[in-house]
Structure formats: C-alpha cells, structure tokens
C-alpha cells in the first residue's frame, strides 16, 4: 500500500495538496486524529485500497511525539510511506488568513494569530524531520499543485533530487536539506549587458564557465552530492532538496541549479525550482 501523510501549518496549502492527491487517484482522509492512523490503515488495507493520502494537523495534539514510531511500524508492515510537510513564513501565513478572513484553528480571544502560528509550529515539531518539507511562502496555488503532482508522480522506488536556486537576500528556503553558498563567485549582475538575463541564458552561462573558481566550486558541489547521496538513500529518504544561493537568486544560483540537475538527470529523478524566478 502506498501511503502519503500530509501535514503542516494551517494556511500553508494542505487542502490543495490533498485535492491534488485525490485527483491522481489517492483515497483521501482529512484531519485524522493520529491515534486512529494505524487502525485506519489496517482497515483500508483489508478493503483493498492501494493508494491512500491522510491529512493530519495540529489538532491531534501531543500525540505527534508518537509519529516516528508509528511511521516505523507502518514501514515494517510493508507500507510505502511518504510524509509531506507544508510550511510558510509567519508573515505569509498572516497575510493569507487576513485575505481569506478565516480563523486559525488554534487562535482564540486570548491567543493572537502570530501566537497561534508559533504554537502550531511547536506542536508539529516532531513531524517536520520525518517529511519532505515544502516552503509555500512564495508559491502560488497553481505552482503548488504542479509541485505535488511532480512529487507523487515519479517511480517511488527511487530518490528524487530537487535542485533549488534562491537569493540570500530573500532568506534561505525552509525546505532545504543541503545549502550551498555561491556568492563568492563573480557576479553577472555587475556586467551591464548580462544584468537583464538569468542563469538560463547563454551569455550568463559563458560568463560563469570562464571563471575557474565557478567551475571548481561546481565540481565540488557535484562531488559532495554524489558522495553522500547513497547515505541519504540508505536512510530511506524519498527526496533530497539541494538549495544553491547567490545574492538575488537570478544568475549564479540559477546556473548552478540547472547545471547540477542536468548532471544527475540520467541517473536519478530530478526536479528543478528557481524560487526567485517563479
């Protein structure tokens, strides 16, 4: 049985994720108390369900500390289990709740919205380390739908490598597993004729490929990922997010993400995301 657990912060896109999973053929259960997870899986397995998506949220309470053991038990019973954790920056979540005029499930007359968001982060702290984390702060609903489809669509027996470019001035992605800083390299932004372009364009690529430092750093990052990827696979990781950052997230980091993705494309399942270009 294939099982996808969807969790995360309220307002981060859990309902969108479960809707996508339902569209691609998963039987979906929403807001399930964690204590009911194993009994439900056993029942659905007996009934012949092959693909199940279950959404769990902070209203399950203190029982989240039990999730690592529950996940281990399900895998020991033969379940192909993946956990997706959706999150976003507090300012993004506050803006979304303000726009929709919905009330946060943990807020009250004595608990403000930012306090409720922080309380939810703390409540779900045991879930995030088990999961593939997706930072939806800068993702549109349509982009998140495509993202979820990509994550559940490939062959589940192989790890999926995600190479993500970003700009440090906008913050490090919350969902990054490995972070590499390429700000030490020559910056095409200061070459007037290259400034309007991105790391996908030939002129920027040629500029960086003419730099011995850029080529040496690219080789080092590729070698690091190649050397340690087997360790992540042995740890039963379904996804590995490799984030590469420069100052603005448009030139150097984009080139590195594109080039690394191309290098691994033939051997692994690869996705590319350019946060500041989306």
Swiss-Prot record:
Q: Where along the chain is GTP bound?
A: 57-60
Q: What does this protein do?
A: Displays ATPase and GTPase activities.
Question: What does the record give under GO molecular function?
Answer: ATP binding; GTP binding
- Binding site residues for ATP: 8-15
A Pfam family for this UniProt protein? Answer: RapZ-like_N
The disulfide bridges present are none
Q: Which domain of life is it from?
A: Bacteria
Q: Which UniProt keywords apply?
A: ATP-binding, GTP-binding, Nucleotide-binding
Q: What is this protein called?
A: Nucleotide-binding protein Tbd_0529
Q: Please give the family membership noted in the entry.
A: Belongs to the RapZ-like family.
Q: Which NCBIfam families match?
A: PRK05416.1
């Amino acid at each position: 049985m294939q099982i996808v657990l969807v969790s995360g912060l309220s307002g981060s896109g859990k309902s969108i994720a479960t809707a996508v999973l339902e569209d691609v053929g998963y039987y979906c259960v929403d807001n399930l108390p964690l204590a009911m997870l194993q009994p439900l899986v056993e029942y659905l397995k007996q009934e012949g369900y092959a693909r199940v998506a279950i959404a769990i949220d902070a209203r399950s309470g203190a029982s989240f500390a039990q999730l690592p053991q529950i996940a281990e038990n399900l895998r020991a019973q033969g379940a192909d289990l993946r956990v997706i954790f959706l999150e976003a920056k507090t300012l993004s979540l506050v803006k979304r709740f303000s726009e929709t005029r919905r009330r946060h499930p943990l807020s009250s007359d004595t608990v403000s919205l930012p306090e409720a968001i922080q309380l939810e982060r703390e409540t779900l702290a045991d879930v995030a380390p088990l999961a593939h984390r997706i930072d939806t702060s800068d993702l549109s609903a349509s982009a998140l739908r495509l993202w979820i489809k990509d994550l559940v669509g490939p062959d589940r027996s192989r790890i999926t490598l995600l190479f993500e470019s970003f700009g440090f001035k906008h913050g490090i992605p919350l969902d990054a597993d490995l972070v590499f800083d390429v700000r030490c390299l020559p910056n095409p932004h200061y070459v007037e004729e290259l400034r309007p372009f991105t790391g996908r364009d030939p002129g920027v690529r040629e500029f960086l490929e003419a730099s011995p430092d850029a080529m040496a750093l690219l080789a080092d990052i590729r070698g690091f990922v190649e050397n340690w990827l087997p360790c992540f696979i042995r740890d039963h990781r379904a996804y590995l997010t490799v984030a590469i950052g420069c100052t603005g997230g448009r030139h150097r980091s984009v080139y590195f993400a594109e080039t690394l993705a191309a290098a691994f494309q033939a051997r692994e399942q690869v996705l590319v995301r350019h946060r500041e270009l989306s």
